[in-house]
From Swiss-Prot:
GO biological process: glucose metabolic process; pentose-phosphate shunt, oxidative branch
Involved pathway(s): Carbohydrate degradation; pentose phosphate pathway; D-ribulose 5-phosphate from D-glucose 6-phosphate (oxidative stage): step 2/3
Pfam families recorded: Lactonase
Broad EC category: hydrolase
MF annotations from Gene Ontology: 6-phosphogluconolactonase activity
Reactions that this protein is recorded to catalyse: 6-phospho-D-glucono-1,5-lactone + H2O = 6-phospho-D-gluconate + H(+)
Keywords of the record: Carbohydrate metabolism, Glucose metabolism, Hydrolase
Transmembrane segments: none
Organism: Cronobacter sakazakii (strain ATCC BAA-894)
Record family assignment: Belongs to the cycloisomerase 2 family.
InterPro entries documented for this protein: 6-phosphogluconolactonase_YbhE, Cycloisomerase_2, Lactonase_7-beta_prop, N2O_reductase_N, WD40/YVTN_repeat-like_dom_sf
The protein, known as: 6-phosphogluconolactonase
Amino acid sequence: MKQTVYTASPESQQIHVWRLEPQGTLTLLQVVDAPGQVQPMVISPDKRFLYVGVRPEFRVIAYRIAAHDGTLSEAGEAPLPGSPTHISTDHTGRFLFSGSYNAGSVSVVRLNDGLPGETVTVVEGLEGCHSANISPDNRTLWVPALKQDRICLFTLTDDGHLEPQTPAEVTTVAGAGPRHMVFHPSKPFAYCVNELNSSVDVWALSDPHGNIECVQTLDMMPADFSDTRWAADIHITPDGRHLYACDRTASVITVFTVSEDGSVLAVQGHQPTETQPRGFNIDNSGQYLIAAGQKSHHIAVYGIEGEQGLLAEKGRYAVGQGPMWVVINAFDA
C-alpha cells in the first residue's frame, strides 16, 4: 500500500501533494496552483478523484488522481449554490454533499462517472451548517447545524433527494455547536465534536433510522484551560480503538480511547500541535496522524503509539499559507 497526502491552503490557493513514506516522513510530489481559495476536500470512494470546494466563486473542482503516484490533474468542475464549508460523498460515488455555513444549507450534486454535474437538491434553514456525513449504510445524511444546536437527519433517496427522517433531528445541549462527525468503523455509534464548548458527544445508533440517543458527552479540554473554546475536527482510527479531536484556541489534539463496543470514550492526553489546528486526518494504516496549523503554515506528522494511542511527533513541514484541510489516499502501485 502506498499513501498520498493532500493539504489545502486557501490563503496561497494551493494544494500540496505528498507521499507518506512507511516510516512516517513526507516527500513533496507536487504543488497545484488552484483557481481560488481551496478549502474542503474529499477523495472519491473509488479513489480516482479528489474533490475540492473553492471560494469566492463557489464551485467544486474534480482533480483526477494519477494511479501510479497520486499526483493531480484537473478534470472538471461544477457550480455550488453556497460557499463550501465541508464536502463529502455517498459511499457509491453517485452524489457529492456540500455543507455551507454562510448559506445555512446543504446541497447534493450528482456525480457522473466521477465528475460533478448538476445540483439535485438544496435544503435550507440549517443555520451554521458545518458538515454533511453519510451513515455507513448510505441511507442517512447527518447534517450538524452549529448555530441551532441540532443535527438534522435526512434519508438519501435513489435520485439524490433528501427527505427528513423521523425523528428529523437530534439536539445537543444549548451552546454546544455541533460541527464535524465520524462513525465507528464497525459498531453502531457516531461521534460529534462540538465547536463552541469543545466537547465530544457519543450517539448510539441501535436503531439508526429511529431511536438515536446521546449516551456520553466528554469535555475535551485540559483541566486548567480557561480561554475561549473553539474545537474544529474529529477522526477515528480504522480499527476504531482511538479517536482524536482538536481545539484551535489551545492548539491541542485530544487523545481518546474507544471502548471495545464503541459506546464509551476516555481521555488519554492532550498533544500540543501546530498553531490553530483547523484540520487533521489519520492515515489508512492507523499508524500516523497529520495535522494542519492554519496560523503556523505547517503540517505535522505524528506516530500513533501504544494502547493509549498517544502521539509522537515525527516531523513538520512548511506548506502553503493558512492550511485548513488534510486528506489521505491509499492505493496499490
